[in-house]
Swiss-Prot record:
The keyword Transcription regulation applies. It comes from Mus musculus (Mouse). This is Ventral anterior homeobox 2. SUPFAM superfamilies: Homeodomain-like. One of its GO terms (biological process) is dorsal/ventral axis specification. Residues 102-161 bind DNA. It is found in: Nucleus. Belongs to the EMX homeobox family.
């Protein structure tokens, strides 16, 4: 019994020792328990705990960048291109885009093949089935070539039709615009036009500023002293006479400078008539001289 009481007395003392062996045993025991727990945990949980830490996240980010860089080099292609300004740029293209692949060769048709294809297109724009097979056999072409030619020909016809419609629409619009401009100009000219004054020579037999005797003798034949007036149109007789022009338009100053032999009432051709009269009277005088 004494031993049992001593053991009971020793128990509390061991618990009270802060830095004794019991504390160190507890730490080792906790570490062993942690190891056991991690050993029993699944690999996914371990990866999740490591990724949750900042160091683990950095390590995982570095690995992903390396994988991306490796994938970029494997699946991408870098090309150096010089632009118009002389600057060199780097373009990253996928390797699936084969730039070195030769272009597809265009099918060249002979004149006879084109003629037959055009004739068939004018007859029917869609050739299918046996007709296409027979046409390809006759022209020594494949059915694919015949099919593609008809597709391209239909596309070309649609483009031509749309272009013609645009031209017609533009021409009709321009014609309508020109017609409207002409009509507008004619309307403006009709509204702005002023009625012309009647001709003075057609309305009056002579100039209104001159005397009445001079009006009638202004147009006289030098060989015939009888006055000859211009014929008056019938329409001018009924129309009213215009107001007389001012006297400054017909000044009588030149008439004052005429010699004294010229009278205002006489004709301007009176000297010529006097000469004719003298010629007519000259044979009688010569006869008188002969008698003397």
């Amino acid at each position: 019994m004494g031993d049992g009481g001593a053991e009971r007395d020793r128990g509390p003392k061991r618990r009270e020792e802060p830095g004794g062996r019991s504390g160190r045993h507890g730490e080792h025991r906790g570490a062993e328990d942690l190891r056991a727990d991690t050993g029993s945990a699944s690999p996914r949980e371990i990866a999740g705990t490591s990724a949750s830490s900042p160091a683990g996240s950095r390590e995982s980010g570095g690995d992903s960048d390396g994988q991306q860089a490796l994938g970029e080099t494997d699946h991408c292609r870098r090309i150096l291109v010089r632009d118009a300004k002389g600057t060199i740029r780097e373009i990253v293209l996928p390797k699936g885009l084969d730039l070195d692949r030769p272009k597809r060769t265009r099918t060249s048709f002979t004149a006879e093949q084109l003629y037959r294809l055009e004739m068939e297109f004018q007859r029917c724009q869609y050739v299918v089935g046996r007709e296409r097979t027979e046409l390809a056999r006759q022209l020594n072409l494949s059915e694919t070539q015949v099919k593609v030619w008809f597709q391209n020909r239909r596309t070309k016809q649609k483009k031509d039709q749309s272009r013609d419609l645009e031209k017609r629409a533009s021409s009709s619009a321009s014609e309508a615009f020109a017609t409207s401009n002409v009509l507008r100009l004619l309307e403006q000219g009709r509204l702005l036009s002023v009625p012309r004054a009647p001709s003075l020579l057609a309305l009056t037999p002579g100039l209104p500023g001159l005397p009445a005797s001079h009006r009638g003798t202004s147009l006289v034949d030098p060989r015939n002293s009888s006055p000859r007036l211009n014929p008056m149109p019938s329409a001018s007789a009924s129309s009213p006479l215009p107001p007389p022009l001012p006297a400054i338009c017909f000044s009588s100053a030149p008439l004052l400078d005429l010699p004294a032999g010229y009278k205002l009432g006489s004709s301007a051709f009176e000297p010529y008539s006097r000469l004719e009269q003298q010629k007519v009277g000259s044979p009688g005088q010569s006869d008188k001289k002969a008698d003397i």
